Amino acid sequence: MRHFFRTQLIPTEVLRIADEFLPEIGMERTGHTARSRAFAGDLGKLQLSVRKEGGHYTFVEISTDQMGESRLDRNAKKFFLALHKAGDPRHRIEAAY
């Protein structure tokens, strides 16, 4: 599956958070470049890339080798939540109904 997220964090900060977050869920870094990371573990394989996108945004893309809504995909969404919290620590995430 592919997941996308746009954040105000700079690319190096996104990669730093990924390097901290993903090993906590049992993923081991298997490759890296200046703008990407590759992880693998019991949950599957994950590719993460970041790029600057018009103005002050960073576009984050995650691809997994899993089908449907796997545990790895749910953790990718939790990673996006961690990015959101890092970008705006005052914002309180709650249900909107």
Q: Regions from the language model: what does each represent?
A:
Residues M1-T30:
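Terminal, regulation- and interaction-focused segments at domain boundaries
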Residues G31-F39:
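Short, hydrophobic/aromatic-rich segments at coil-to-beta transitions
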Residues A40-Y97:
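Beta-strand/loop substructures that line and gate deep hydrophobic ligand-binding cavities in soluble
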